[in-house]
UniProtKB/Swiss-Prot annotation:
Pfam families: PEPCK_GTP (PF00821), PEPCK_N (PF17297)
Catalytic residues as annotated in Swiss-Prot or TrEMBL: C277
Any one biological process term the GO annotation gives: cellular response to glucose stimulus
Subunit architecture: Monomer.
Enzyme class: lyase
Keyword annotations from UniProtKB, A to Z: Cytoplasm, Decarboxylase, Gluconeogenesis, GTP-binding, Lyase, Manganese, Metal-binding, Nucleotide-binding
Gene source species: Rhodococcus erythropolis (strain PR4 / NBRC 100887)
Protein name per its UniProtKB record: Phosphoenolpyruvate carboxykinase [GTP]
Chief location bin: cytoplasm
Enzyme Commission code(s) on record: 4.1.1.32
GO molecular function: GTP binding; manganese ion binding; phosphoenolpyruvate carboxykinase (GTP) activity
Binding site residues for substrate: R85, Y224, G225, G226, S275, N390, S391, R392
Length: 609
């Protein structure tokens, strides 16, 4: 099939909706390779949403939910083999292997292009190829970060409408020669003439590949989330982190929170936590201390750059939330529930109730019968998860009742504090303030979480996840640490955000949590704000500054003084045991570990001696 015979390649009326020569040439090249039945330029309209969601319902991919419960919302259940990001099949194909570094899978880019080119050949037969123009961050930014995803998945098109600024207005912004990231995606499930489709097409062979120097993403075989919605982790973190390194900014796996004091002063906080450490819950926190309020600007990704005034400003490049459903409820995260309840949401791999609503583990209610995420009848006696542990909601940010008005401001917001955190039962106190920027980078470089189940590795083993970026770095981790240090050195030290390390998950000897977490974490945020204002007391310890017992506002909190003391304790023996674990991690990072990080490590060892 030649390009001339592919319907839609030149628009519906023979005139392409863009005059961007490079884009049109790329669309034609990919269409000739993948051989779709037709090409459609996505416009992001309500009519398109209605048409594609109806098509997905008719295909059995989507179930339309009860409009009275979840208006304009849908449930999709994936193939059981396609339920999460696949780190083992995710590649950073830099020109030189050293530039991918020890934390990434690497293949020679020419070899990968040949391998994937063979997979792409004819892979869209029987399907429509959609051209999805999108923008990460506000479209009216000074330098908007544009992309175009080519995909044969309607699920991707409707999800990208929620997660990004997408459609005709982005094509207009591209003009005739604007730069864009090329993002190619296929389910890898061609259809022969007359072949019946399956509800969730995918391929056992999967690749999620990034070419950082070329700013390109190639994804094959998966229809799921971060593997297929290429604006999210692939562009906004892996490719953007490489762009940020080259251009002098930061692309980080961070929430952005606005905390407002009783005096009505706003503080903006960015925080990086690995998965299962409460990032979305903190992003949407309801403070429990009187007079304090919180608003959110994002729960997952922050792009940060220095403004003309020397302060570090952050924007959230996303347009929607792609949150983990299990554990989300009216107690743990009421604002997420209020966002979802307004509808316009795509759910994936949650359970379906008898009245056409959704349910997952941890949600209020005690259903006696459900259709589970695999499409099977489910009762409490089934002994299986009704919803997949990584099931998701994809919902517009604009629906969140506590979105800060400035969330869509291309200038961003000035960051006062950066938080790093992991899930540690021992060793790491509730909150520690770094001595300075470089010490803060050392803290971020050593973030880790204990493995929680034998299936994930030995229980208690610390999995390092530097700045919560381990799965998302687009280049060498050592160069990444150096980039953080360099940005700090080139900035006005008095205007740099203060850096803190938090750990909501410390446990007592009997295994119970010492700190209640959730909304009570606002008490820790209050201490952080008071440290920024030079008002709160702290104790200098070998690992940094921790609050005095009296400096933390625990008024009205039902936690014993002994538990607070233990949560804040710096146990020298535990930290001495941590040293060889950090050494092992730094050995893995290898020759590119910055001297500044090594200096901080040696200083810590001396303070512990």
């Amino acid at each position: 099939m030649t390009s001339a015979t592919i319907p839609g390649l030149n628009g519906t009326d023979g005139t392409p909706p863009t005059q961007h020569k490079e884009l049109l040439a790329w669309v034609q090249e990919v269409a000739e390779l993948t051989q779709p039945d037709r090409v459609v330029f996505a416009d992001g309209s309500d009519e398109e949403w209605d048409r594609l969601t109806t098509k997905l319902v008719e295909a059995g991919t989507f179930t339309r939910l009860n409009d009275e419960k979840k208006p304009n919302s849908f449930l999709g259940n994936s193939d059981p083999s396609d339920v999460a990001r696949v780190e083992s099949r995710t590649y950073i194909c830099s020109k030189e292997e050293i530039d991918a570094g020890p934390t990434n899978n690497w293949m020679d880019p020419a070899e990968m292009r040949t391998l994937m080119g063979d997979l792409y050949r004819g892979c869209m037969r029987g399907r429509t190829m959609y051209v999805v123009p999108f923008c990460m961050g506000p479209l009216d930014a000074e330098d908007p970060k544009l992309g175009v995803e080519l995909t044969d998945s309607e699920y991707v098109v409707v999800s990208m409408r929620v997660m990004t600024r997408m459609g005709s207005k982005v094509l207009d912004k591209l003009g005739t020669d604007g730069f864009f990231v090329k993002a190619l995606h296929s389910l890898g499930a061609p259809l022969a003439d007359g072949q019946e489709d399956v509800a969730w097409p995918c391929n056992d062979t999967k690749y999620i590949t990034h070419f950082p120097e070329d700013r390109e993403i190639w994804s094959f075989g998966s229809g799921y989330g971060g593997n297929a919605l290429l604006g999210k982790k692939c562009y906004s973190l892996r490719i953007a982190s490489a762009m940020a390194h080259d251009e002098g900014w930061l692309a980080e796996h961070m929430l952005i929170l606005k905390l407002i004091s009783p005096e009505d002063k706003a503080y903006y906080i960015a925080a990086a936590f690995p998965s299962a450490c409460g990032k979305t819950n903190l992003a949407m926190i309801q403070p429990t201390i009187p007079g304090w309020r919180a608003e959110t600007l994002g729960d997952d990704i922050a792009w940060m750059r220095f403004g003309e005034d020397g302060q570090l400003y952050a924007v959230n490049p996303e347009f929607g939330f792609f949150g983990v459903a299990p554990g989300t409820n009216w107690s743990s995260n009421p604002n997420a529930m209020r966002t979802i309840d307004q509808g316009n949401t795509v759910f994936t791999n949650v359970a379906l109730t008898d009245d056409g609503d959704v349910w997952w583990e941890g949600l209020e209610g005690d259903p006696q019968h459900l259709i589970d995420w695999k499409g099977n009848e489910w009762t409490p006696e089934s002994g299986t998860h009704a919803a997949h542990p990584n099931s998701r909601y994809c919902t517009p940010m604009s629906q969140c009742p506590i979105m800060a008005p400035e969330w869509d401001d291309p200038k961003g917001v000035p960051i006062s504090a950066i938080l790093f955190g992991g899930r540690r039962k021992t060793t790491v106190p509730l909150v520690t303030e770094a001595r300075d920027w470089q010490h803060g980078v050392f803290m971020g470089a050593t973030v880790g979480s204990e493995q929680t189940a034998a299936a994930e590795g030995q229980v208690g083993t610390v999995r390092r996840d530097p700045m919560a970026m381990l799965p998302f770095l687009g280049y060498n981790v050592g160069d990444y640490f150096q980039h953080w240090i360099d940005l700090g050195k080139s900035a006005d030290a008095s205007k740099l955000p203060k850096v803190f390390y938090v750990n909501w998950f410390r446990r007592g000897d009997d295994g119970r949590f010492l700190w209640p977490g959730f909304g009570e974490n606002s008490r820790v945020l209050k201490w952080i704000v008071e440290r920024i204002e030079h008002k709160a007391a702290g104790i200098d310890t070998p690992i940094g500054v921790v609050p005095t017992g009296s400096a933390l506002d625990i008024d009205g909190l039902d936690v014993s003084d002994a538990d607070i003391t233990e949560a804040l304790a710096v146990n020298i023996d535990e930290w001495k045991a941590e040293i060889p674990l950090i050494e092992e991690w730094f050995d893995f990072v290898g020759e590119k570990l910055p001297t500044g990080i090594r200096d901080e490590f040696e200083a810590l060892k001396q303070r512990l001696a």
